[in-house]
From Swiss-Prot:
It comes from Aedes albopictus. Residues 15-33 have a biased composition (Acidic residues). GO terms for biological process: positive regulation of translation; tRNA processing. PROSITE patterns: HTH_LA (PS50961), RRM (PS50102), XRRM (PS51939). Residues 1-43, 343-383 are annotated as: Disordered. This is La protein homolog. Residues 141-228 form the RRM domain. Residues 249-368 form the xRRM domain. The keyword Cytoplasm applies. It is found in: Nucleus; Cytoplasm. Pfam families: La, RRM_3. Keywords: Cytoplasm, DNA-binding, Nucleus, RNA-binding.
Amino acid sequence: MTEVEAKATATEETTKEEEEAPETTAEQTEESAQETSENVSKLEASTIRQLEYYFGDANLARDKFLQEQISKDEGWVPVDVLLTFKRLKSLSEDKKVIVDAIEKSDEGLIEVSEDREKLRRHPERPLPEQNEETRKEIYGRTVYVKGFAPEEGTQMSELLEFFEPFEKITNIVMRKYHDKATKKYLFKGSVFVTFATKDHCAEFLKKEKLGYKGKELIRKMQDDYFEEKKAERRKKDKKKEEDRFNIDHLPKGASVHLSGFNKDTSRETIKETILKLDESLEVAFIDYAKTDTEGTVRFAADDAGKKFMEKLTDSKIQIDEEEITARLLEGDEEKEFLRKVVKDQQARRQASNARNKGRTPEGRQASRPPQEWRRKAKGGRGE
């Protein structure tokens, strides 16, 4: 049996809690659990698979409880302790059955102590270093598969049986979510399947059609699945951002970009020049700072920018003895500018609120006349 691959989506649950963990995993042998020699029973094959899952790469890397047990006695873990794990206990509570089974494994991952009371991961099979390189390597041979009828209560045993014909699957992860109504982790209907090699992974994806209980399965590389999810999140975030900075209330066709200012031009000069051109044009705001060479004028009414442009010759206007080039903002450029306007407005509002909140009650009271003075001023009983 191959070692369990380090799961990219590993949880912090201990082995004792694995029945409630957000994900359920299972290891299979390279030849699959069913392709054992004739002298290994189905029970023994299941026992071997479960024990090698406990001591395998994926589980051992995240299982704090088992790590603690391993640290106590040169890696040895009493079989009695392992039998407190529900899944192993459900297979057999007989220590002899457990030990006899693991001794029949061809994988060589687990050692049995001389007194047959303890098990440990073989010292010559150290746990691989858990780093970014390892994670990427595993992602490169892991497939996302969806369509396993969660409403029918699909079990890991059914998934193991389904994937049995495919070559050298080393790990299966049942993806789960927390259901608030039942307060339980329920199967999503999708799994991550890790193959021993990239070639086996590619062969699995090349199969034309693959179904489960009459439903075609969706298959893609885990990396591709994650990238698609990232793209979906970015799209949702962008929509949230657009909703947050809604520009519907701002006038359209009212923003004009001006370029060519000298360093001494002020906003007041720009506004005065525009009003001299047409005093009916109401300027809402000028996005410009002195010494800038360009800026944007936002008018207060719809299409006021268009009206302003119609009064220019060749899109030019003279400001501070400089020939300034004007350009009406339209389409995406206008939307982007108006979103910036809303962001700036919100930032100024938040800064103002923060300043107001920063005032102490004592400070606010000190700015007002004492209560006795107010009474006297109103003709009240001050004495």
